[in-house]
């Protein structure tokens, strides 16, 4: 095998989190976009899901005149796309793909994945089918783009992140094999399930039967497409050595390489701007907490926080809250602590009473609302964070450790 390095002439990157912040992959892609765009310019194209039915997308700026003829040709084939720029540094070209036209064809597409790759979709529910249709549509769009704008001598590479986009790479392997495919998993489906169910993931990794456990945890479809993606993409990558070992045993293929996540040097502000932003953020966070809790901080609180996907155990939210409880119980604690938990959770929007009070402090706070949340929670009774805080010293009036839960957006966007 040749070790020669080749740079693609056309580079596509596909993720459910392009212009759609859900978790860390959004950060991974958005913070490298400036560097990639500097190298490839408009030969670098990002693809994400068109979720315009959920409201205006604040991260996307559409350009109705960009690639107009090509968009029309795709529309004639039954796929609608919007083309524009991602409003981040580098302003990369983005194609948002409306995959709704594929819904009537879902059985045909799932059948094709089974016949070509033995992807077992039979138990997959909508949270599986929806991203599979998006991934498939993204594959169709990439093939059309290369056919329209590429030349026979140009090298095209399509990079797919996570199982949610894997159908795109599998589509290209069959229908446009001249486009090289790369699949990156940031965390395996089964790894999340095993750890989330309190099984010793890393101690017993070689002993697990991933396919059998997938059936037990009812994630056969997601595990199956991830496993086949690892097997059938031209290159298989992951982001850490520990996840690479996970892939070896749970997906049956060792990754071809490990690409650690990186950030631009200007990922955070510097100098005076940093301190100004920091002070502004502190004031806002303290004001929101005081309004929610109906208590004033007596000094200068230490602000800590945790964020990420709402995986109570895997993301260490349980450990974070337990640590706060122990801190609150310590007689050595002298300084007040304000803890923010910002994770996506089902909600009906920000509290109106809180917004009104922050705009006009004479407006009262609704005493009937859950005081540790900034939003109206959908299922507060069953919420793990709410239940972990319930009847603990973290909810005691006058506790030196105060907790605010910010359900940043609905989990429905995955």
What are these regions (language model features)?
Residues 1-414:
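Catalytic cores of nucleotide-sugar-dependent glycosyltransferases that transfer UDP/GDP/TDP-activated
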